[in-house]
């Protein structure tokens, strides 16, 4: 059974181990999980995952793997062997890539991480998609990629809260992980398609990724507690 009792995932978006652990030491693993992204992982490698797990945290390894099927599957396998709770891949890598990742996890013994697909990044709007040759609404592309992810056997999707309701209706078995969550009154920063924590859960999100409103708060523990209270 998970030690964490809430849907909150705090993003440890820091350049150094020291900064990340300084924040982690102010957080309660019963109230949140933590996300390790590219900057921190490249700076610290697998050691940061082990250290966070030893502190009681379940770790979402947010590296968004996207490569040929075998290479991506081996990366997912390596993440699983580190003991991460969740790992993600880009759905735009295609059905064969995602299926290879699912299969490599099923061949392992022991606990399996949640395998999550990334649809359309929350910073992207229609004009951004048009710039890469997709002249469609982001939600249309999200639904296309979601169908591929479900067919490949993924456990869930990373998506904007504004896509959550449609995704939950179309794919009720998939767990939805939503970045771009901003408590009421927070700055939007570079996340465009955002909702508050309560709005995101009501829309169908299962896990909420929150970064700067907690990590940059004067009192991160208090900020986390306020989010948890909003969700109660």
UniProtKB/Swiss-Prot annotation:
The active site is at residue 64. It comes from the Bacteria. GO terms for biological process: 'de novo' pyrimidine nucleobase biosynthetic process; 'de novo' UMP biosynthetic process. Disulfide bonds: none annotated. SMART domains: OMPdecase (SM00934). Signal peptide: none annotated. Pathway: Pyrimidine metabolism; UMP biosynthesis via de novo pathway; UMP from orotate: step 2/2. The keyword Metal-binding does not apply. It holds the Pfam family OMPdecase. GO terms for cellular component: cytosol. Its EC number is 4.1.1.23. It catalyses: orotidine 5'-phosphate + H(+) = UMP + CO2. Substrate binds at residues 13, 35, 62-71, 122, 182, 191, 211-212. Homodimer. This is Orotidine 5'-phosphate decarboxylase. The gene is pyrF.
